[in-house]
């Protein structure tokens, strides 16, 4: 797979931009807040259907504009595919593949795969559980585009059940009478989310452990574990549903007092440990960076295994966060086989060999320019 071009119109701070990609390595250099991350965000939007930096499409549209356009040309499996997404404030998106409008966003996923690694990804270790859940979901959206619908159904069921729990118009008896129906809906929607996350961790964990051993020299043992509220000794749907139903009954009184659902995949945790010690609490900054790097390289490898294509790698100002050893491990893993787009504020972070084999472009105030003159 190779990303040949990216076009932006009224996206973030880009009025109009056309990026042609001819090299396996592209370095975007510029000061902070010039638009480097915005360009990578647009690529990730086409790959996953969502932004990790914006809650609403309105935030992605240039100030004073009503809509934005993101498009790309991708070469994959011997074919060239044109992808396009139109964003409108407060309205549904329009997605096109090969010039044909698709009925749903799901139908436009699966043509472009990418792994994004930014300084914000250090929150995978030290951040809230939601950060780790979002990371899992982002991978699943690329491995199984239908997961978009699976996740949306759960979110809808969760919001509806929470609205019922918060209702001030229902008596305790009326609430107790209606909850079992909403319990069933929540459980049926939650089960496929939890089973997919569990299977993903089962496949990802050994890859991450191997990468971590390579980076750390085998001095530490890294473990990634899925920690839902229920036991996953039996992973079949019926067992998961039964366990969720039993836990809902246990939490019913507490849920009524708090007015929110306390059972489901929105409460899942992903445990990251080094030598059986929680990395979030006790890992040094260097250990945490090694851990995140191992997770990202494992993600890259898993996407290639499942899709049969090497995904695009987006590195957003992350090299400055890594020491020389970890930089070498990352850049060595990439080499020529992984198409990579890197953003940076300084070219001094790259060795001369890497620079010679890369296309260097400048980003300034939402404009893409020619390579800077050598010093």
Swiss-Prot record:
MF-aspect GO terms: ATP binding; single-stranded DNA binding
Single GO BP term: double-strand break repair
Cellular component GO terms, alphabetical: cytoplasm
Entry binding sites for ATP: 30-37
Gene3D superfamilies, per the entry: P-loop containing nucleotide triphosphate hydrolases, RecF/RecN/SMC, N-terminal domain
Keywords: ATP-binding, Cytoplasm, DNA damage, DNA repair, DNA replication, DNA-binding, Nucleotide-binding, SOS response
Location within or outside the cell: Cytoplasm
Pfam families registered for this protein in UniProt: SMC_N (PF02463)
Major location category of this protein: cytoplasm
InterPro entries reported in the protein's UniProt record: DNA-binding_RecF, DNA-binding_RecF_CS, P-loop_NTPase, RecF/RecN/SMC_N, RecF_2
Function: The RecF protein is involved in DNA metabolism; it is required for DNA replication and normal SOS inducibility. RecF binds preferentially to single-stranded, linear DNA. It also seems to bind ATP.
Sequence similarity: Belongs to the RecF family.
Name of this protein: DNA replication and repair protein RecF
Native organism: Gloeobacter violaceus (strain ATCC 29082 / PCC 7421)
Name of the gene: recF
């Amino acid at each position: 797979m190779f990303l040949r071009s990216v076009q932006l119109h009224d996206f973030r701070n880009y009025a109009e931009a056309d990026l042609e990609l001819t090299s396996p390595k592209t370095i975007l250099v510029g000061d902070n807040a010039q638009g480097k991350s915005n360009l990578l965000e647009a690529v990730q939007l086409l790959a996953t259907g969502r932004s990790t930096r914006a809650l609403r499409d309105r935030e992605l549209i240039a100030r004073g504009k009503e809509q934005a356009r993101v498009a790309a040309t991708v070469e994959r499996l011997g074919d060239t595919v044109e992808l396009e997404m139109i964003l409108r404030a407060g309205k549904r998106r329009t997605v096109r593949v090969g010039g044909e409008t698709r009925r749903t966003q799901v139908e436009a996923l699966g043509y472009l795969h990418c792994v994004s690694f930014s300084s914000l990804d250090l929150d995978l270790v030290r951040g809230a559980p939601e950060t780790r859940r979002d990371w899992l979901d982002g991978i699943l959206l690329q491995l199984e585009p239908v997961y978009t619908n699976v996740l949306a159904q759960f979110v809808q069921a969760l919001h509806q059940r929470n609205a019922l729990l918060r209702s001030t118009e229902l008596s305790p008896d009326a609430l107790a009478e209606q909850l079992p129906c909403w319990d069933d809906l929540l459980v049926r929607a939650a089960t496929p989310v939890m089973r997919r996350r569990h299977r993903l961790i089962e496949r990802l964990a050994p890859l991450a452990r191997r990468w971590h051993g390579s980076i750390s020299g085998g001095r530490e043992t890294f473990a990634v574990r899925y920690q839902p509220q229920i036991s996953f000794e039996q992973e079949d749907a019926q067992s998961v549903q039964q366990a969720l139903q039993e836990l809902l009954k246990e939490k019913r009184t507490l849920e009524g007092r708090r007015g929110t659902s306390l059972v489901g995949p929105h409460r899942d945790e992903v445990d990251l440990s080094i030598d059986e010690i929680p990395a979030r609490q006790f890992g040094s900054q260097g250990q945490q960076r090694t851990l995140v790097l191992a997770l990202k390289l494992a993600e890259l490898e898993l996407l290639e295994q499942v899709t049969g294509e090497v995904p695009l790698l987006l590195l957003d100002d992350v090299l400055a966060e890594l020491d020389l050893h970890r930089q070498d491990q990352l850049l060595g893993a990439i080499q020529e086989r992984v198409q990579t787009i890197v953003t940076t504020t300084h070219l001094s972070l790259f060795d001369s060999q890497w620079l010679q084999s890369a296309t260097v472009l400048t980003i300034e105030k939402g404009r893409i320019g020619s390579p800077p003159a050598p010093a």
